[in-house]
Structure formats: C-alpha cells, structure tokens
C-alpha cells in the first residue's frame, strides 16, 4: 500500500508539471489532483490534458472543425448539413467530410469524459466476460492449458487460480486472452448519458458515441481490467508461495525422527 501511495504521489507531481507547462492548471484542477489518491481516477482527470499524437480528432481541429463539433454536441440545430457546408474550404471538400471530422472530435471528447468512462467501467464490472482461445499451431506445445483452449467465464466469478493459469498461458504465447463486456449495454448506457433527442444532431452524437466506445473507450477500459486481473493473479501466486514456504519452514527437519537439538 505504501509503495502504491508513493507511486501515485510521484505521478501526481508529473501530471501537475505537465498541465502547468501547458498553462492550463487552474486552482480548482490543482486541488482536485492533489486530493486524488485513486490511480484510475487520476488518469481520467489527466486524460484531456495528456499530450496526444496526431489523432483523427487533432487533424479535424487543425481543419477548423471544432466549432462544428460544439454545435452538434448541443443537439439543437435542425439543419446541421447546411451548417456543415459553411466549413467547406481548401482542407474540407464537402459537408460529409466536415461532419465526419466533427464526429471524430466528439468521439475523442467522449473518451476523455469521466462520466462516459465510468459508465463503461460499471458495465465491465457488471457483466464482463474473460475468454481465451489457443493460438493456432500451439495445441501440442500448450497441452497443459487444454482446459483454456476455448474458455469463457464472467470475470467477477473467475477465481484467482484460473486467472493465474490464463495469464501464464498468455505470457507463454499459448493463449489469446480477452475481456469483453456487453457491448450493447455499454453503448446504451452512453446514449442515456449523452443523447438528448432524436434529431439529426442527436443521431450524429449517437454515432460518435458508438465510434468512441469501439475505437477508444472499450480498448482503454479493457486494458485497465486486464491489468487488474493480472494483479489479482499475481497476488494469489505470492499468497500461495508464502503459504507453501511457511509450511516448509515449519516442517520437521528430519521427518518423523525425534530431535533433541540442532
């Protein structure tokens, strides 16, 4: 626990320095970061400020499409294609390209939204399934993992020893392991959060949400849960090792023979 707190403290310092260097560190944001000791929540807070590679959303911003994304997000404009036509220029060839770029911006914003990410996390907790398949051609080499060649089980019911076996099989290149929630339930929960009606803008928001979920949010949250399951398996391995070592150290040194002293 102490090591985790130290690690989180160092991470907070790095995050504060990064945001301050961008001249985006407000007093409220600083207080929030300083008060946060949950590593996952801390990364969610930092995500909108995290330096990005050249993403689809960043390309769209450079084309001047962020104001269009704002209009779509408000979900009030009834003639959005007509509005999108105003953004056609040397970099944007038509209204469809303008709407696609604005949707890319929205998808990235949804991925950086804590409520959206927590909504998907909740669905992972409720119904994620951990599954494994044997890597083609590894059947004979990985015979000891035969029980996991075509395996699936709700993650919340998967025991530590199964997690340990799955992660060992994955590390040895025998198994492909995946953690997946109910995709439909995840998208529905996001729609409940963000979609405000059934107009054209709302349809674009719903489409951007689906794209954000499949392309950005789901892979990110799956990585989180994979790391958590690995930690659970590692903790179990340490516990079993400690238990076995304890029994070994307490065992009579000469078996059934009586010992007066050593």
Stretches found by the model and what they are:
Residues 1:
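Catalytic phosphate-handling regions of large nucleic-acid enzymes and associated NTPases
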Residues 4, 8-253, 258-262:
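Duplex nucleic acid-engaging cores and interfaces of nucleic-acid transaction enzymes
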